[in-house]
Amino acid sequence: MEIKHPATAGTLESSDIQITLSPATSGVAIQLQSSVEKQFGHQIRSVIEATLAKLGIENVAVDANDKGALDCTIKARTIAAVYRASDNKTFDWEEINAWIN
């Protein structure tokens, strides 16, 4: 998949994360805002990077605003943002379920 235009998934509610993706030309750049960044920033970035890699996304700018989201929520929001930003309307749920657990 390829990021074609900016897209957002998630909210700024407690226990959620808002992920905004934009096209980029050189790699994955993650801008993270989180009240728990010192404790969990590395883990949040790792989950986002791993999810993007599973989806084949190599060039993207990520703006993540975390409000205490669990890993499963971070994965779900990242997947939703990628599908929106790539205009992909075909979901292979069996494949996604196989690697998100």
UniProtKB/Swiss-Prot annotation:
Keywords on record: Cytoplasm, Phosphoprotein
Gene assigned in the entry: citD
Localisation: Cytoplasm
Oligomeric form and interacting partners: Oligomer with a subunit composition of (alpha,beta,gamma)6.
Species, as recorded: Lacticaseibacillus paracasei (strain ATCC 334 / BCRC 17002 / CCUG 31169 / CIP 107868 / KCTC 3260 / NRRL B-441) (Lactobacillus paracasei)
Protein name (Swiss-Prot/TrEMBL): Citrate lyase acyl carrier protein
Domain of life: Bacteria
Family recorded in the similarity comment: Belongs to the CitD family.
Modified sites of kind O-(phosphoribosyl dephospho-coenzyme A)serine: 14
Function: Covalent carrier of the coenzyme of citrate lyase.
InterPro entries named among the record's database cross-references: CitD (IPR006495), Mal_deCO2ase/Cit_lyase_ACP (IPR023439)
Cellular component aspect of the GO annotation: cytoplasm
Stored Pfam families: ACP
